[in-house]
From Swiss-Prot:
Disulfide bonds: none
Cellular component GO terms, alphabetical: mitochondrial matrix; mitochondrion; nucleoplasm; nucleus; pyruvate dehydrogenase complex
Gene: PDHB
Enzyme superclass (EC): oxidoreductase
GO molecular function terms attached to this record: metal ion binding; pyruvate dehydrogenase (acetyl-transferring) activity
Chain positions recorded as K(+) binding sites: 142, 190-191, 193, 195
Organism of provenance: Homo sapiens
GO biological process assignments: glucose metabolic process; pyruvate decarboxylation to acetyl-CoA; tricarboxylic acid cycle
Location (main, coarse): mitochondrion
Identification of the protein by name: Pyruvate dehydrogenase E1 component subunit beta, mitochondrial
Oligomer and partners: Heterotetramer of two PDHA1 and two PDHB subunits. The heterotetramer interacts with DLAT, and is part of the multimeric pyruvate dehydrogenase complex that contains multiple copies of pyruvate dehydrogenase (E1), dihydrolipoamide acetyltransferase (DLAT, E2) and lipoamide dehydrogenase (DLD, E3). These subunits are bound to an inner core composed of about 48 DLAT and 12 PDHX molecules. Interacts with DLAT.
Binding, thiamine diphosphate: 89
Modified sites of kind N6-acetyllysine: 354
Lineage: Eukaryota, Metazoa, Chordata, Craniata, Vertebrata
């Protein structure tokens, strides 16, 4: 009775507020998309947008791709635009380059970039050099794509990083996506580019889901080639990486943050042309640099970054020598314990960061 009389004595507006039914709601979960599906979506949208785009490679059509990246595209676009080829990288890469010279926009899939060695003449001599050799008269709008870098248990001839190989060649653009957003935005930009673009995907990342922001779901979503992304802001040290090791760098940064060390993690996205402006600006802020890559140490991507820092304005801002974290200088072993020790792990990145900061 006391509670009821208390309500009676209160103003009507206040009583109605107390009696109003309250609803609790949870925000919808962010859309999760795997890297595989993001690439598939990007190719699908570009095939739909431009009838000059087509995909060719081993098992890309009826089998939906060795890694199911082209799943559903053959059923949607048919034999003329999703083309299964014989096991001859030199042959179908040459056909693709010729088609690009004739005005089409081929996507040439290598089952693994290790097999692109069979077609290196077509990629370098035919695709990369033609625009220059023709005095700018003959563009070659072609995409070479497929899994790159270390895989699991496939040994030396199927496990290595080609970022430095192709990044060395003028006339090529080279991109190396990490997450689903990267994968879709970069594959679409690569297909629309009038130059040959090498898209270095990662086999171990295909099935990994990432949050897919609303802007990435648009058919107009593009990531500009030649622009890096700061994945984590920091003030103590700059950590630069590409492809799968970006995730390792973020894990290392999370561990070190608990110890008071704030790492700025840069996802390169593009190997060539390299976004040195973003890297230099970060180094000028943090005064320290660590590069991380899955490739071999000699003449690698990290070595190129360090050389450019030495030659540019950021060098005078360094408080300690730059440090590289790379794969081991050996062909990829088969045994799992040796394989794990041949590519950078989170502990290796943490060690390098602490070494650079002298902590």
């Amino acid at each position: 009775m006391a509670a009821v009389s208390g309500l009676v004595r209160r103003p009507l507006r206040e009583v109605s507020g107390l009696l109003k039914r309250r609803f609790h709601w949870t925000a919808p979960a962010a859309l999760q998309v795997t890297v595989r599906d993001a690439i598939n979506q990007g190719m699908d949208e570009e095939l739909e947008r431009d009838e000059k785009v087509f995909l060719l490679g081993e098992e890309v059509a009826q089998y939906d791709g060795a890694y199911k990246v082209s799943r559903g595209l053959w059923k949607k676009y048919g034999d003329k635009r999703i083309i299964d080829t014989p096991i001859s990288e030199m042959g179908f890469a040459g056909i693709a380059v010729g088609a690009a010279m004739a005005g089409l926009r081929p996507i040439c899939e290598f089952m693994t970039f290790n097999f692109s060695m069979q077609a290196i003449d077509q990629v370098i001599n035919s695709a990369a050099k033609t625009y220059y050799m023709s005095g700018g008269l003959q563009p070659v709008p072609i995409v070479f794509r497929g899994p790159n870098g270390a895989s699991a248990g496939v040994a030396a001839q199927h496990s290595q990083c080609f970022a430095a190989w192709y990044g060395h060649c003028p006339g090529l653009k080279v991109v190396s996506p990490w997450n689903s957003e990267d994968a879709k935005g970069l594959i679409k930009s690569a297909i629309r580019d009038n130059n040959p673009v090498v898209v270095l995907e990662n086999e171990l990342m295909y099935g990994v889901p990432f949050e897919f922001p609303p802007e990435a779901q648009s058919k107009d979503f593009l990531i500009p080639i030649g622009k890096a992304k700061i994945e984590r802001q920091g003030t103590h040290i700059t950590v630069v990486s590409h492809s799968r090791p970006v995730g390792h760098c973020l894990e290392a940064a999370a561990v070190l943050s608990k110890e008071g060390v704030e790492c700025e993690v840069i996802n390169m996205r593009t190997i060539r042309p390299m976004d040195m402006e973003t890297i230099e600006a970060s180094v000028m802020k943090t005064n320290h640099l660590v590069t991380v890559e899955g490739g071999w140490p000699q003449f690698g991507v990290g070595a190129e970054i360090c050389a450019r820092i030495m030659e540019g304005p950021a060098f005078n801002f360094l408080d300690a020598p730059a440090v590289r974290v790379t794969g081991a200088d050996v062909p990829m072993p088969y045994a799992k314990i040796l394989e794990d020790n041949s590519i950078p792990q989170v502990k290796d990145i943490i060690f390098a960061i602490k070494k650079t900061l002298n902590i």
